[in-house]
Design a protein with these regions (language model features):
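A common structural junction motif
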Residues: 17-34, 88-93
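Short, extreme N-terminal segment that most often corresponds to the first beta-strand
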Residues: 1-27
């Protein structure tokens, strides 16, 4: 499951999506929809592989008034779009990929950006063997002892990311509870389609 947390307000985030140059023609030609609708987080868990229409939602909850949550149906969590919004709004962005091991591409990642610039990256994932990589300065809530574990897959995993979220004041299990605002972007045609 990929999701992001932005430290900004809902209206500014929504405006940044509407003003994104990537979607200018698509919006004018009614090839994408941006609308209010109830959040269905299940649509974004274990998204499909390959080419498919993008869909993503952003929302606020009464539990976290100063945070915007974002999830998409793309495996990379729409990382380029997230960095664009962070840069445009001059806000902090945290991106997570949380996996328990049932997925085809098992691994966990954590990224922190500020104003669109990468500040911290930590990855532990399985290719033909386990890989661990980190870059940037440690954040105050990190436990660097985890990163020297002999078993690479234990250096960054589901439990560690849930712990880090908790230290950030976020409970992973209620990010979709008490939703106060939610917008969804949905592509209904490719730009090259008539």
């Amino acid at each position: 499951f990929n999701f992001s947390v932005f430290e900004c307000d809902f209206e500014s985030f929504t405006e940044a999506i509407h003003n994104c140059k990537w979607y200018e023609q698509s919006l004018l030609q009614n090839k994408v929809l941006i609308r209010k609708q109830p959040l269905n987080l299940d649509e974004y868990i274990n998204p499909p592989h390959g080419a498919h229409y993008e869909e993503y939602s952003w929302w606020t909850t009464s539990n976290y008034k100063d945070k915007i949550f974002f999830a998409s149906n793309h495996r990379d969590g729409m990382s380029s779009l997230c960095k664009y919004v962070s840069r445009e709004l001059g806000c902090k962005l945290y991106r997570f990929r949380i996996s328990k091991g049932e997925e085809a591409y098992y691994g966990c990642t954590f990224f922190c950006c500020n104003k669109g610039k990468d500040e911290r990256a930590i990855l532990a994932y399985m290719e033909d063997r386990w890989v661990f990589w980190q870059e940037g300065e440690l954040l105050p809530f990190e436990n660097p002892a985890y990163y020297s574990n002999r078993f690479i897959k234990k250096r960054l995993n589901y439990d560690i990311l849930v712990e880090y979220l908790g230290k950030m004041g976020i409970n992973l299990f209620d990010i979709d509870s008490n939703v106060t605002n939610c917008m969804t972007f949905e592509r209904i045609k490719w730009d090259r389609e008539e």
